[in-house]
């Protein structure tokens, strides 16, 4: 697998697509950004490999927070990476929930080859378990969502 070079124009265009994709929890829009052998790493899910595994992980996430969306704050890039700072938010257990993250992306043929998410999971986990109205949904999706 060859990693694509990244310049400011590519980073800007990708950040716009990322922002558009996250305006609504539409799994098909997310899938359109992924390479077949994408690798996704984030604090609560560990590492997920392949488009099918990512599809399943995102489906569980959207089942837990059906109105999940993101607001992009900034974008940066290196020679072969894009960094996006954003806030994810939605409704869980009848109340708003939000957390900040920074993701690092690498690309193959213009599609995401690797996505590494950086965020402090502790406040998010405390909110998830601290809202009894969401426990049923958490019980149905949480074990699989947080499994490693």
Which residues fall in each region the model found?
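A short hydrophobic beta-strand element
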Residues: 79-88
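Short, low-complexity N-terminal intrinsically disordered segments enriched in polar/charged residues
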Residues: 1-32, 135-148
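Short, cysteine-centered beta-strand-loop-beta hairpins and adjacent loop/turn segments enriched
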Residues: 63-64, 89-98
């Amino acid at each position: 697998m060859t990693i694509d070079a990244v310049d400011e124009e590519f980073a800007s265009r990708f950040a716009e697509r990322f922002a558009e994709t996250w305006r609504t929890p539409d799994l098909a829009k997310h899938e359109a950004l992924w390479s077949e052998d994408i690798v996704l790493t984030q604090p609560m899910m560990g590492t997920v490999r392949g488009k099918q595994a990512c599809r399943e992980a995102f489906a569980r996430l959207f089942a837990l927070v059906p109105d999940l969306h993101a607001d992009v704050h900034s974008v940066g890039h290196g020679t072969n990476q894009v960094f996006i700072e954003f806030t994810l938010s939605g409704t869980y257990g009848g109340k708003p929930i939000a957390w900040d993250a920074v993701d690092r992306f690498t690309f193959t043929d213009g599609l995401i080859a690797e996505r590494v998410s950086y965020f402090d999971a502790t406040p998010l986990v405390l909110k998830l378990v601290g809202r009894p109205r969401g426990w049923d949904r958490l019980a149905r999706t949480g074990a699989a969502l947080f499994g490693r």
